[in-house]
Amino acid sequence: MLDSLLAIGGLVLLRDSVEWEGRSLLKALIKKSALRGEQVHVLGCEVSEEEFREGFDSDVNSRLVYHDLFRDPLNWSKPGEAVPEGPLKALRSMCKRTDHGSVTIALDSLSWLLCHIPCVTLCQALHALSQQNGDPGDNSLVEQVRVLGLLHEELHGPGSMGALNTLAHTEVTLSGKVDQTSASILCRRPQQRATYQTWWFSVLPDFSLTLHEGLPLRSELHPDHHTTQVDPTAHLTFNLHLSKKEREARDSLTLPFQFSSEKQKALLHPVPSRTTGHIFYEPDAFDDVDPEDPDDDLDI
């Protein structure tokens, strides 16, 4: 499960709730990235650095760069700055990293950032973070950037949620029952169809996962060859094919704007000596023609 979430770059959105917290899964993904040799940047907003690093071993902590916004979110400790930028400055500084190889950026949390940064500005910063691609001749840029964003979805309206969902390459929605947590994963890969899966897991104290089962949410992702195929034409309200009598009846019909032989002859072989126009009128079957009063059917 962790490997599938970390397989591609871009924004990975972890949506939790009051009942099912997502920080444990976030730290499990951070541990997995660090053990793969990646540099991990953490923008900590909701808990202290000591609390966040608790539970990680020395190998993981050595690869973890913590940007602390918990103690001084608005840069009040630096009175020399005329306009403290706070969290926005931290995000912009992370956009200018010079690390080599793949980099994982963890935002704890996006909900806190949404409370201090306008949604449009935050989305622009997230797009800049997740879309960094290095040039072949530039060794200072990273190969792949992965942004892990923890989002408390109950705190936000549909506008902010919709904007972040549009940016995300992978969406993880946490729920569950009793002591087991489920993660419903929507993964969008470039030039491929989106995939839906759900996993049941438990997070251990060392932030490793114990998987219980994986169930696809949509059966068409893994089709069962033993299931009966439904005929899509079985319950139509119209006929796809005509019988012989129906075809003959269709061919014998006169189209509404089909020219008669007299009109065709007059149009194709005009009389040279005729200088005045000629009006052809072919009444329909339902026309009420009254020679004495031709305007009788007009609603005046």
UniProtKB/Swiss-Prot annotation:
It holds the Pfam family Elong_Iki1. Residues 284-300 have a biased composition (Acidic residues). Transmembrane segments: none annotated. The modification Phosphoserine is found at residue 252. It is found in: Nucleus; Cytoplasm. Keywords: Cytoplasm, Nucleus, Phosphoprotein, tRNA processing. InterPro entries: Elp5 (IPR019519), P-loop_NTPase (IPR027417). Disulfide bonds: none annotated. GO terms for biological process: positive regulation of cell migration; tRNA wobble uridine modification. Pathway: tRNA modification; 5-methoxycarbonylmethyl-2-thiouridine-tRNA biosynthesis. Residues 279-300 are annotated as: Disordered. Tyrosine-phosphorylated. Its main location: nucleus. Signal peptide: none annotated. Component of the elongator complex which consists of ELP1, ELP2, ELP3, ELP4, ELP5 and ELP6; in the complex, is required for optimal binding of ELP3 to ELP4. Component of the elongator complex which is required for multiple tRNA modifications, including mcm5U (5-methoxycarbonylmethyl uridine), mcm5s2U (5-methoxycarbonylmethyl-2-thiouridine), and ncm5U (5-carbamoylmethyl uridine). The elongator complex catalyzes the formation of carboxymethyluridine in the wobble base at position 34 in tRNAs. Involved in cell migration. Belongs to the ELP5 family. This is Elongator complex protein 5. It comes from Mus musculus (Mouse).
